[in-house]
């Protein structure tokens, strides 16, 4: 009798579909929750410190030691950041289908550290090579050797590969530490996404302030070496918390591949495409009602096919439908995210041309102004949690305050507004350069304070809190349970594709406006460029994307995760 009561208590204390580090059912009191989540948040702080230590000032390195033009450097930055944001789809696939999130994080971290180490080595070789060239040839415009360039870009893309495996799995693994079947832990999981973003913003801000200063005022080798050290510390912290984690059962034991299950739905539906979907006793009543009228092509996978084709289960069909419904939302997210790619490229290059003195005798590096994004997030997240959400709950009578799609939509509006503000500030900068006769003096400092750029950086932080966090929570919540790494990867891939599109737009516009001897919108001399026209174009794109998003969000049917 006592044994039976002990077993019942153990079952009541355990978390369904999760095990501990020994492979036993995960206990609520001994694993998971905020205790484990803070280890994982700490890991992400270190990783974001490393990533932004490289990415935030990359355009300065490309146009400086590597000697690239502004347009070429902007395209290279967008291509790299786009690749780094697309690769999480592959990393999530490997995690969800084969390795599991924990093992994928460890392997990806090792690749990440290798890339950062080689990046540091390449920067040492580049700086040594440039120094030797200038001593022997007295050529101030010397460029690094080709093979050293190759090493630099290979190491840079190794970092992207490491980030591709690390990024979607760490956040999903953190969210896995909360049991959605427990009402209190479900609320905590919602807060996790907000505090996750606030904490990693601390890592980003610290990186932008410290690492960028070292890169601009000490040397690039040390500026790349510090992020490598932080990534080593992040991996050590992650391994230290191993015994406290809850592991999804798929990470510790074999199970049906979710990709195979859902892929089979599309295959069977295609084979049954000529069959008529009618309730003739072949379908269960519940399955028929759920599928009737929405994506009926996939619902045909529920029918027994010719030649003895086994029908798919209603759960598999519903999971496939959930993924398909996400595609239109994902596409509009891509369009509205294009403006986000500009802060690490043109915002930074514009900052080089203006007065950057913020204190007597102290001139802030232009890339360090990105720290204002983190400051905005520090203010916006607590305001969102403690002020905005309670007011929204009073008005809407919903526990969540606003829906995830409403949160994303608010971010889209702010994104369009941000491009309008950026365009107006750039018009002011060009006008000031013209008034003081500095149009043909690109190296001269325009008598305009860098504080003019504050609003567009603060708006970027607010966009993150609404659009980026909302998108991550939405895709994590709405994909099938076994594919949550893929869900987060989809939100990241929207940013990646947006970076590629931004690079493509820059290439096309640079060619179209710069041919026949004209001044390109992205002229290396920014005083003769028209980046403001580009910002107006992006504001229009984002507004159109928001209108499409409004229509699609009204048609979207939320997937009830708590019932799956």
Curated annotation (Swiss-Prot):
Annotated membrane topology = Multi-pass membrane protein
Superkingdom field: Eukaryota
Q: Which UniProt keywords apply?
A: Membrane, Phosphoprotein, Transmembrane, Transmembrane helix, Transport
- KW tRNA-binding (keyword) present: no
For this protein, the record's Gene3D superfamilies field holds: MFS general substrate transporter like domains
Q: Record keywords: Nucleotide-binding included?
A: no
Q: Tell me the GO BP annotations in alphabetical order.
A: nitrate transmembrane transport
Molecular functions per Gene Ontology: dipeptide transmembrane transporter activity; low-affinity nitrate transmembrane transporter activity; tripeptide transmembrane transporter activity
- Tell me where it mainly resides: membrane
A Pfam family for this UniProt protein? Answer: PTR2
Q: What's any one GO cellular component for it?
A: plant-type vacuole membrane
Residues that span the membrane, as ranges: 49-69, 80-100, 110-130, 145-165, 192-212, 220-240, 327-347, 358-378, 408-428, 450-470, 486-506, 533-553
Question: Record's PANTHER family?
Answer: OLIGOPEPTIDE TRANSPORTER-RELATED
Q: Which family does it belong to?
A: Belongs to the major facilitator superfamily. Proton-dependent oligopeptide transporter (POT/PTR) (TC 2.A.17) family.
> Can you say what this protein is called?
Protein NRT1/ PTR FAMILY 5.16
* Organism from which the protein derives: Arabidopsis thaliana (Mouse-ear cress)
Encoding gene per record: NPF5.16
């Amino acid at each position: 009798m006592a044994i039976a009561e002990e077993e019942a208590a153990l079952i009541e204390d355990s978390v369904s579909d999760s095990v501990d580090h020994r492979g036993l059912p995960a206990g609520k009191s001994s694993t998971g929750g905020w205790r484990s989540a803070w280890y994982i948040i700490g890991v992400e702080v270190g990783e974001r410190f490393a990533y932004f230590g490289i990415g935030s000032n990359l355009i300065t390195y490309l146009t400086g030691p590597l000697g690239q033009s502004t347009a070429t450097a902007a395209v290279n930055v967008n291509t790299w950041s786009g690749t780094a944001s697309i690769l999480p789809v592959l990393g999530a696939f490997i995690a969800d289908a084969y390795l599991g999130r924990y093992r994928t994080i460890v392997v990806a971290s090792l690749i990440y550290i290798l890339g950062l180490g080689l990046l540091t080595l390449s920067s040492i070789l580049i700086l040594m090579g440039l120094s030797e060239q200038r001593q022997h040839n007295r050529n101030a415009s010397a460029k690094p050797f080709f093979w050293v360039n190759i090493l630099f870009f290979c190491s840079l893309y190794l970092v992207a590969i490491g980030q591709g495996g690390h990024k979607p799995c760490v956040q999903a693994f953190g969210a896995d530490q909360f049991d959605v079947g427990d009402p209190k832990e479900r609320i905590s999981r919602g807060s996790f996404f907000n505090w996750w973003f606030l904490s990693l913003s601390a890592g980003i801000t610290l990186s932008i302030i410290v690492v960028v200063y070292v890169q601009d005022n000490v040397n690039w080798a040390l500026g790349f070496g510090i992020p490598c050290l932080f990534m080593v510390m992040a991996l050590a912290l992650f391994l230290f918390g191993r015994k406290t984690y809850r592991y999804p059962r798929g990470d510790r034991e074999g199970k049906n591949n979710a990709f195979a299950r859902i892929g089979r739905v599309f295959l069977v539906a295609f084979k049954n495409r000529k069959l008529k979907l009618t309730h003739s006793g072949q379908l269960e009543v519940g399955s028929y009602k759920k599928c009737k009228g929405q994506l009926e092509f996939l619902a045909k996978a529920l029918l027994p096919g010719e030649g003895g084709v086994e029908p798919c289960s209603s759960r598999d069909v519903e999971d496939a439908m959930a993924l398909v419904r996400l595609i239109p939302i994902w596409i509009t997210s891509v369009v509205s995210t294009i403006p986000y790619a500009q802060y690490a490229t043109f915002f930074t290059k514009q900052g080089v041309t203006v007065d950057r003195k913020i204190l007597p005798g102290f001139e802030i590096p232009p890339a360090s102004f990105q720290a204002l994004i983190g400051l905005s997030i520090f203010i916006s997240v607590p305001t969102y949690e403690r002020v905005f959400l309670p007011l929204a709950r009073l008005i809407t009578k919903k526990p969540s305050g606003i829906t995830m799609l409403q949160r994303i939509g608010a971010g889209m509006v702010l994104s369009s507004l941000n491009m309008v503000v950026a365009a107006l500030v750039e018009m002011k900068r060009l006008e000031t350069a013209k008034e003081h006769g500095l149009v043909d003096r690109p190296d001269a400092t325009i008598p305009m304070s860098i504080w003019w750029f504050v609003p567009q950086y603060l708006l970027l932080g607010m966009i993150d809190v609404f659009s980026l966090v909302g998108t991550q929570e939405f895709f994590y919540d709405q994909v099938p349970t076994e594919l949550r790494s893929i869900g987060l990867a989809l939100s990241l891939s929207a940013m990646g594709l947006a970076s590629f599109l931004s690079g493509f737009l820059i290439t096309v516009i640079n060619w179209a406006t710069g041919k026949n001897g004209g001044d390109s919108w992205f002229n290396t001399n920014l005083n003769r460029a028209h980046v403001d026209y580009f910002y107006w174009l992006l504001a229009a794109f984002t507004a159109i994307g928001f209108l499409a998003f409004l229509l699609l969000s009204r048609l979207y049917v939320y997937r009830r995760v708590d019932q799956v």
